[in-house]
Curated annotation (Swiss-Prot):
Originating species: Sarocladium schorii (Acremonium strictum (strain IMI 501407))
Gene field: asL1
Pathway: Secondary metabolite biosynthesis; terpenoid biosynthesis
Gene3D superfamilies (alphabetical): FAD/NAD(P)-binding domain (3.50.50.60)
Active site per UniProt: R213, Y246
Protein name as it appears in the record: Salicylate hydroxylase asL1
Binding site for FAD: E47, A60, R131, D329, A342
Induction behaviour: Expression is significantly up-regulated under xenovulene A producing condition.
Glycan-carrying positions: N87, N168, N250, N400, N464
Practical and industrial applications: Xenovulene A is a natural product exhibiting little structural resemblance with classical benzodiazepines yet is able to displace high-affinity ligand binding to the benzodiazepine site of the gamma-aminobutyrate A (GABAA) receptor and could be potentially used as an anti-depressant with reduced addictive properties.
Length: 480
């Protein structure tokens, strides 16, 4: 961060709402803004684009993430329903909605459409939607005037307890707030400001996987896959690649994503998207099952080719620095092979909502208005340290686990009939990893968050040097 600068004491009386800057107007940033606004916390969202913008690709939310949405504010779940979210599994019971099938081998020459089932697992209440449509509905819940577009962050200043945090933008303007939360994604400028441009964690690394995304009209997809496959989530696995599809937009469109391995370096680390083609995918899947190839032939001729980057090799050492923190992909950008990055971003939002509510209570309880600014600054720092303690382990586990499951999907053994039995043992591991995501103890996280914050506050008041870190053993119900 920039060199120190002294500020005059700013009034932080309980009557004046706490003011938080959220850098980034994607799904995580907007969900966080909705939750904080409902707590009478003034929010300013700074988005570098000219409008809310998301790609039209599909995404899914598990029941755990939807529970977090409800706890933050039920209007978030309502926005998900309004955008045409599709039930991908039974709402009230476990449903083996995740299906893996052999996308490479033909097991019944007399039935060219047959694909051998490999595994089925699932949990209750998954919903799929289009990213852009969900963000459009979420944006309706953000207070008018809370979002400022065309604001590209240049630098941050957080230099003194009794002054504001200052955001400097590339257009020459600046903003002063009580705290900054970076929700600005995998290329996070806030993360770079926290650690420095040359720090390894400031820049994501190429995973040597690329994704080609496309949408297929459901009636065309049914012609190739049949109504059952087209109407349900499937992973087609094979050597060096896998293809995933599931319905979105009220079952009118099939979202298709082909993931290919790429041994070469990515040519431009500043651009994660390049123009690709349907022919690229067909070349990468040469020799695969005819059903998979027929589905690929329904994709548009021109496709976006996305390089998959993550923060696995050089993770952020901390998610907080003073009165600045990072959340979502800015903190723990993951490859998409668990389909859970956004879900854990929603968990982050709940954790931050709980903490900033506690900060408000801390400041409101202070009877000395002259000391409110200092009390607010220290409470925010405590909250952000707590956020790092509570969220770091689980989110970093996801980043690593996502790479692991992709390696299992892409095993060369799928092409060798003598090795199929070995290859199929991977699904026990995939199930265990998936359950850690789906059956997370949200109530345990909320309890740990509150307890950790209070212990840190209490420890600071006692001046005993404790950082108030709870071990996992002290929270037996709180797991990865």
């Amino acid at each position: 961060m920039d060199s120190p600068e002294v500020y005059e004491v700013v009034d932080a009386s309980p009557e004046k709402p706490m003011e938080i800057a959220i850098v980034g107007g994607g799904i995580v940033g907007v969900i966080l803004a909705i939750g904080l606004t409902r707590q009478n916390i003034k929010v300013r969202v700074f988005e570098q684009a000219a409008s809310f913008r998301e790609i039209g690709a599909g995404m899914a939310f598990n029941a755990c993430a939807r529970n977090c949405m409800d706890l933050i504010d039920p209007v978030i779940t309502q926005a998900l329903l309004r955008c045409g979210a599709v039930n991908m599994s039974d709402v009230d019971a476990e449903d083996d909605y995740l299906r893996w099938i052999d996308g490479y081998n033909q097991h019944r020459p007399e039935d060219p459409s047959y694909q051998r089932p490999l595994s089925e697992i699932g949990g209750a209440g998954f919903r799929g939607c289009r990213r852009d449509q969900f963000l459009e509905e979420l944006a309706k819940e953000v207070p008018q005037g809370a979002v400022e577009f065309r604001k590209r962050l240049a630098s941050l200043e957080d230099n003194t307890d009794n002054g504001p945090v200052v955001l400097n933008f590339t257009d020459g303007t600046r903003a002063e707030v009580d705290a900054v939360i970076g929700c600005d994604g995998i290329k996070s400028v806030v993360r770079k400001q926290m650690f420095g441009t040359n720090h390894p964690a400031s820049n994501a690394q190429y995973t040597h996987k690329v994704a080609y995304r496309g949408l297929v009209p459901m009636n065309r997809a049914v012609e190739v896959l049949g109504p059952w496959k087209a109407g349900n989530f499937h992973h087609h696995v094979g050597p060096g690649a896998h293809l995933t599809h599931y319905p979105v937009a009220n079952n009118t469109v099939l979202n298709v994503v082909a993931f290919l391995s790429d041994p070469n370096p990515w040519p431009d680390n500043q651009r994660m998207e390049m123009e690709g083609s349907r022919e690229d995918v067909l070349t990468g899947l040469k020799g695969w099952h005819p059903t998979v190839l027929n589905l690929v032939n329904l994709l548009p001729e021109k496709l976006s080719k996305w390089a998959l980057f993550d923060l696995c090799e050089f993770p952020a050492p901390s998610y907080s620095a003073g009165r600045v923190c990072i959340a979502g992909d800015a903190a723990h950008a993951s490859s998409p092979h668990h389909g859970a990055s956004a879900c854990l971003g929603v968990e982050d939002c709940l954790c931050l909502n709980v903490l900033l509510a506690q900060v408000r209570e801390t400041v409101a309880a202070n009877q000395d208005p002259a000391k409110n600014r200092l009390a607010l600054s220290r409470a925010i720092e405590t909250a952000f340290k707590t956020f790092d303690t509570v969220r770091h382990k689980r989110t970093q586990w996801l980043v690593n686990s996502s790479r692991r499951v992709c390696d299992l999907y892409h095993q060369p053994e799928w092409a060798d009939p003598t090795r199929w039995a070995k290859a199929e043992t991977c699904f026990e591991e995939i199930r265990d990893r998936s359950y850690k995501i789906w059956y997370f103890d949200v109530d345990g996280m909320v309890k740990q968050t509150r307890d950790e914050y209070e212990l840190r506050q209490h420890g600071e008041k006692l001046g005993n040097g404790t950082n108030g870190v709870f071990s996992d053993e002290r929270h037996g119900g709180y797991t990865l």
